[in-house]
Amino acid sequence: MKNSEKEIYFHVGLAKTGSTFLQNNFFPKLKDIKYISTHKYWRCINIIKRTNYKSYLISREFDRQFEFEVKKILKEFPQTKIIVVFRKHDKWISSQFKRYSKNGYHWSFEKFYNNDNTGFWRKEDMLYSIKMDIIKKYSKNKPLVLRFEELKENPYSYLSKISNYTGSRYSKSDISLNVVHGSWSEKQLIFLKKFCSIFKKNPPEYYANNKILHWLLYRPWWLLFHFIMYLAYFLPKSYIIKKPLIDKEYLSKSMKKYDNDWKKILSISD
């Protein structure tokens, strides 16, 4: 079979929109499609070229690498169809901040994101319309646009939209709706951030493409961070939390500028 004749579907995340659940509990259970897991993403192009399945599903969640990765896959397989999931901006940025916090970043939320656009996370990182423009730039096919909230509210409707779009099948009895990774509490994250601000000023580097360095230089810190957060579970809340991890009023005011961006997503979501 020619590569141009193969049906290819590319789930691009975003990160913190239920991607891990899909990658662990749903995509491997789909029938009539070859799923290339996130752990094999780095060689997915070679896998597709060297095998002869009728259709393929690739999955990997992106944020700042979004355009680079979309361009890379579409350059090899222009027929690729995109699956993208968005989440309401306030919930999404909060979840992103917590993810970075548990990985050793000890800055405040205001330094992570602020209205002056001087934080680590910038306005261009927040605009979903920019990501939709990137998809339209490289793909001629209509993407499947989903909302993370629907996965929570009506999971089987959400999952069926993916199976229908990809021409695959699944059995409800095969799908576990259990959360794959539970979230850490505010108390645990604040305690870890205090620890890192004293003992680990710079977060450990993540070696995605080098397993040896990953296990030698990153994994020990990862294990220690988890131990610290586990320890925090047994400490009094009043001892740790002096102020909220994220100020809700500040968050609400900061996110108002993205109301129209979210309305655009609601108007095009499937």
Question: PLM ranges: what are they?
Answer:
Residues 2-270:
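Anion-recognition interface
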